[in-house]
């Protein structure tokens, strides 16, 4: 909501609704059915007088807040795009960038977090959830196969940002195949994890994997929560993450240090 206008995604449309009268100010629909918003509950992001929305075609679009006119659209999928890649999170706007997650459902692919320039749509950086050869964590996947290329880790929950710390936080999904752990030996980083990334560069600041080698689809099930806490008389910037089985994890969001004992 901004200046009394509600902005929302519904089916294959983005609406601007007058909050006082309920009248439609404008409606925008992509050119093709394949590009429709997914899913309707993901919502939109606002910033710099633009409305940002994710598309089924693994694209992000920016619309003018006042008219709904398309300003830019940019692909955040792989090249060539992997089947099923979608932007399933509401875009987040902060410090001149738009942050989104990309997921392929449970069909594999490579989950990722992408940052785009809010004004132009140019991609600033991409962080792949499953590390590539030579990257930290790649050794947590089988070294004698290419299963990592379809290892999953879809980013399907909206993230959150702390501009003061310069970090953006996302939860990642389960590895793929979901229950076929025998073909993906290892911890399978950075699936089923909390990721803290540098907002400017996309570099990993810290991570915590809530399930190693997940074979239960027990990844994080709710958006991450940032909050302020007092521990031993000292103020702490904290983060809460809840796993699908209801276990709650609490972290110092600056360092990733657990605030409660984890066994």
Across the structure, where does each feature detected by a protein language model lie?
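Short coil/turn segments that connect the beta-strands within blades of beta-propeller domains
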Residues: 3-5, 48-49, 95-97, 164-166, ...
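Repeat-solenoid scaffold signature
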Residues: 89-120, 213-263
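Extracytoplasmic beta-rich repeat domains
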Residues: 1, 27-48, 70-90, 107, ...
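Residue position within the beta-strands of beta-propeller blades
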Residues: 8, 53, 100-101, 170, ...
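Short loop/turn segments that connect beta-strands within beta-propeller blades
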Residues: 18-21, 64-67, 117-120, 199-201, ...
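Short glycine/acidic-enriched loop and turn motifs that connect beta-strands
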Residues: 13, 59, 105-108, 175-178, ...
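Beta-propeller domains
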Residues: 9-31, 186, 202
